[in-house]
């Protein structure tokens, strides 16, 4: 726990998946509901291209408005977790942080993170990748670990593992892009044996 009386929680949202806006909306709900008397909250957004930035603690800025979702945008700063220590630092760049000639002109220590609450959806959020980063940083986090996240993200692998453990699963067929391109008709024959309707899930 940090030196202050409340543990510090890092709320992580946005991300590189197609569900970026949904993640921002989820964060708005969490930031509204979380008990500020018990938690010291730091909102951290990840842009669509994977940049980590500190975001204003304003749930209304992350909610859907007139049916339109919100996105995390980056300025001249970036945020990072230090490996093995779990400290959060904010780097200020001169000029465009993404430019090859840019350089760091300021570093602010934001303190130790006690726990991370990831609200990311899809790739780079639910597939074990960011969970592995938290493990390397030595920070506790909410949700499944690296292995279970990676297995659960791949529906074919999930069913294979469950079936191997003796757990009943529904019948399924895996159709790869290569198989479909080579012989779509044969793929359809396999699918039709399942009986319709069927659920189609990219894995």
Label every PLM stretch briefly.
Residues 22-29, 126:
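Conserved alpha-helical elements of sugar-nucleotide-dependent glycosyltransferases
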Residues 17-22, 33, 52-53:
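Short N-terminal binding/cap micro-motifs at the start of the first secondary-structure element
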Residues 46, 54, 58-135:
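N-terminal glycine-rich "phosphate-gripper" loop used for MgATP/nucleotide binding
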Residues 132-150:
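Short, acidic/small-residue loops that bind anionic groups at enzyme active sites
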Residues 2-13, 17-18, 24-25, 41, ...:
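Active-site nucleotide/adenylate-binding loops and adjacent lid/helix of ATP-dependent enzymes
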Residues 40-48:
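A short beta-strand-loop structural module common to alpha/beta enzyme folds
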């Amino acid at each position: 726990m940090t030196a202050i009386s409340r543990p510090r929680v890092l709320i992580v949202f946005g991300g590189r998946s197609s569900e970026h806006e949904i993640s921002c909306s989820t964060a708005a709900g969490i930031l509204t509901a979380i008990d500020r008397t018990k938690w010291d909250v730091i909102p951290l957004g990840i842009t669509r291209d994977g940049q980590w930035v500190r975001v204003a603690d304003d749930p209304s800025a992350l909610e859907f408005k007139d049916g339109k979702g919100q996105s995390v945008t980056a300025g001249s700063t970036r945020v990072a977790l230090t490996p093995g220590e779990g400290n959060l630092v904010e780097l200020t760049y001169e000029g465009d942080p993404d430019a090859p000639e840019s350089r760091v002109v300021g570093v602010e220590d934001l303190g130790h993170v006690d726990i991370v609450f990831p609200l990311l959806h899809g790739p780079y959020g639910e597939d074990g990748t960011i969970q592995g980063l938290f493990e390397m940083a030595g920070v506790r986090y909410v949700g499944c670990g690296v292995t279970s996240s990676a297995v659960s993200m791949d529906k074919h692998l999930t069913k294979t593992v469950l079936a191997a453990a003796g757990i009943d699963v529904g019948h399924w067929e895996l159709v790869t892009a290569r198989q479909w391109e080579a012989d779509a008709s044969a793929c359809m024959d396999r699918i039709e044996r399942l009986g319709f309707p069927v659920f189609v899930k990219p894995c």
